[in-house]
UniProtKB/Swiss-Prot annotation:
Top-rank taxon: Eukaryota
SMART domains for the chain: ZnF_C3H1 (SM00356)
Single biological process term from Gene Ontology: cell differentiation
Region forming the signal peptide: none
The entry's keywords: Differentiation, DNA-binding, Metal-binding, Nucleus, Transcription, Transcription regulation, Zinc, Zinc-finger
Misc remark: Plants lacking PEI1 produce white seeds in which embryo development does not progress through heart stage.
Designated name of the protein: Zinc finger CCCH domain-containing protein 54
Region described as Disordered: 175-204
Length: 245
């Protein structure tokens, strides 16, 4: 059995929510089946699996195809696809989960300094392949965010920094049941470090537990999102929680 994920390694994405993340196009009357179109870029091709493409083009560059096809098998972005990412070279955001995006209503949009979704989070240069995949060479995932050999391990790019860091603040009345709210401190945040610690001051053990509890409740799915026939079944993403120490 693979080890369970550490809550400090990534924000929680409930398994029940995978089915409502993204989109899929299926043939009428034959749900989940697709015609094989050799003209569609093969996600397994070496160029599409390179670090450069994964970090700076995967689900960023627009797909040149106009015909309906399986978006999960295509490395390009499609209009309306939730897996679409912002180019980290063009937009300044860090590999820290956006707390507003979980409600599907981050008012900052592309100007937000935090990652919107699984792909922006794990394909960010500060995180992509900076950890080893527990499955190693046995990994069968078409797109894995982790390294499968020592030579694939990357050093986190320190230039991707965030101005804000989350800290738990004791609320005086109101707030959630724990009497804790979240505050953003205007200070440097190194995305290569654990989201539990930032700046010069370390949180005490009690604050760490509170912060981890807050992060464990985070998700990337719009709470008001209504599934449609264009939804993408990403049940295969249950491997995320299994592959992170």
């Amino acid at each position: 059995m693979l080890k369970s994920a550490s809550p400090m390694a990534f924000y929680d994405i409930g398994e029940q929510q995978y089915s409502t993340f993204g989109y899929i196009l299926s043939k009428p009357g034959n749900a989940g089946a697709y015609e094989i179109d050799p003209s569609i870029p093969n996600i397994d091709d070496a160029i599409y699996g390179s670090d450069e493409f994964r970090m700076y083009a995967y689900k960023i560059k627009r797909c040149p195809r106009t015909r309906s096809h399986d978006w999960t098998e295509c490395p390009y972005a499609h209009r309306g696809e939730k897996a679409t990412r912002r180019d980290p070279r063009r937009y300044t955001y860090c590999a820290v989960a956006c707390p507003a995006f979980r409600n599907g209503a981050c008012h900052r949009g592309d100007s937000c300094e935090f990652a919107h979704g699984v792909f922006e989070y794990w394909l960010h240069p500060a995180r992509y392949r900076t950890r080893a995949c527990n499955a190693g060479n046995l990994c069968q995932r078409k797109v894995c965010f982790f390294a499968h050999a020592p030579e694939q391990l990357r050093q986190s790019e320190g230039k991707h920094r965030c101005r804000y860091a989350y800290r738990p603040v004791r609320a005086r009345g109101g707030g959630n049941g724990d009497g804790v709210t979240m505050r953003m401190d205007d200070e440097g945040y190194d995305t290569s470090r654990s989201p539990v610690r930032s700046g010069k001051d370390d949180l005490d053990s009690n604050e760490e537990k509170v912060l981890l509890k807050c992060w464990s409740r985070m998700s990337i799915v719009d709470d008001h999102y209504e599934p449609s026939d264009l939804d993408l079944d990403l049940s295969h993403f249950d491997w995320i929680s299994e592959l992170v120490d």
